[in-house]
């Protein structure tokens, strides 16, 4: 499993380490991918970091979890690289792939991405959004979900799934992942 963080975050923030620890009991090795300069992200640098961590490591059992700006970054990577064509799961939290009016400093980064949605292949694609996310409006996540031919799972939450709004753990996400690992139907 690979966890991709977002803007102004690090590998130690939010629920990332908690999820990695939880997955050990399922014999899933988890890497939280370090992305450089998160306060002033550069697409080439982030793409290089993802490439370094994921190249030649993806297979039919791979799961990728991405949060916020990490979502469009990993989708950009997966759509253009010759990577394993059908990973097990893609879990996208507060994802978007369009400029956000409240974060114009990210417009250049986002506009440089060239996600080719027809090249995104996973056995399970799950998008999750908070119904009152002050950072990424749920409508942006809904538009992303449409492009991925999936529906957004809407959770009642007044935040961006960050530690500062109470997300040190993320049981709903863990349960969705483990349901897939156990070949059970998820709550979705």
Map each language-model feature to its residues.
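Active-site nucleophile loop of the alpha/beta-hydrolase fold
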Residues: 6, 35-38, 90-100
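Catalytic active-site module of serine/aspartate enzymes centered on a nucleophile-bearing elbow/loop
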Residues: 166-188
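Catalytic histidine neighborhood in serine/cysteine hydrolases
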Residues: 28-31, 146-162
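Gly/Ala-rich beta-loop-alpha elbow adjacent to hydrolase catalytic centers
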Residues: 65-74
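Active-site catalytic motif of lipid deacylating hydrolases and related acyltransferases
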Residues: 1-60
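Catalytic histidine-centered segment of alpha/beta-hydrolase-like enzymes
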Residues: 41-42, 158-171
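Conserved alpha/beta-hydrolase "acid-adjacent" motif
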Residues: 134-140
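Short beta-strand/loop motif that positions the catalytic acidic residue
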Residues: 121, 126-129, 133
